[in-house]
């Protein structure tokens, strides 16, 4: 089954036929998928501006904005078919919310054995933080303010804290996040 956004604010579970895997593909059975609070909420509300439809397209998205669209990119599952070195391994993939799927083996990343699927599903959030730092890399001695102590902001602040001689301040207008921001 797959989750589809039928129209802004209205989703549905649809059946699907799992395609036959090709050479070099893997069949993954989903263990966990995550909904990003920012991007996917924007998509669910139908808030993606037409000028951003191409830029916001997810790697294995089906359909188009505002809907119907099968969207998502935080998926952790177990490889059930595919190259021997991947079979039985837990993997992360930028795939929508679906119970099973077929993708090229290169589209999955093996999750370390000591990382539970409930935590591994957050890998996409860390990827967003890494991309932000690639777009605006800090220099030694920089003083950086990260605005927003949500998932992405906390990941950015944590990564910045590992840079030598970079002073990081995490701030948020939400008073309930003050403890996280101060840490």
Residue ranges, per PLM feature:
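Short structural boundary motif marking the start of a folded domain
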Residues: 1-2, 26
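Short N-terminal binding/cap micro-motifs at the start of the first secondary-structure element
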Residues: 9-14, 36-39
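Short loop/helix-cap segments at secondary-structure boundaries that form the rim of catalytic
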Residues: 86, 101-104, 178-182
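A structural motif shared across PLP-dependent enzymes of the aminotransferase-like
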Residues: 92-105
């Amino acid at each position: 089954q797959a989750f589809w956004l039928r129209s802004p604010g209205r989703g549905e579970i649809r059946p699907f036929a799992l395609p036959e895997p090709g050479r070099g593909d893997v069949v993954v059975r989903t263990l966990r998928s995550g909904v990003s609070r920012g991007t996917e909420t924007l998509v669910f509300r139908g808030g993606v501006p037409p000028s951003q439809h191409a830029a916001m397209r997810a790697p294995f998205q089906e359909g188009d904005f505002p809907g119907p669209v099968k969207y998502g990119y935080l998926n952790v599952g177990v490889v059930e078919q595919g190259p021997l070195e991947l079979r039985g391994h837990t993997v992360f993939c930028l795939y929508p919310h679906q119970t099973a799927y077929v993708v090229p083996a290169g589209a999955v990343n093996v999750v370390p054995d000591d990382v539970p699927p409930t935590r591994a599903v957050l890998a996409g959030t860390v990827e967003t933080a890494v991309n932000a730092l690639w777009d605006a890399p800090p220099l030694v001695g920089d003083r950086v303010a990260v605005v927003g102590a949500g998932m992405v902001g906390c990941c950015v602040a944590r990564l910045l804290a590992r840079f030598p001689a970079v002073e990081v301040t995490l701030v948020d207008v939400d008073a309930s996040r003050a403890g996280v921001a101060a840490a």
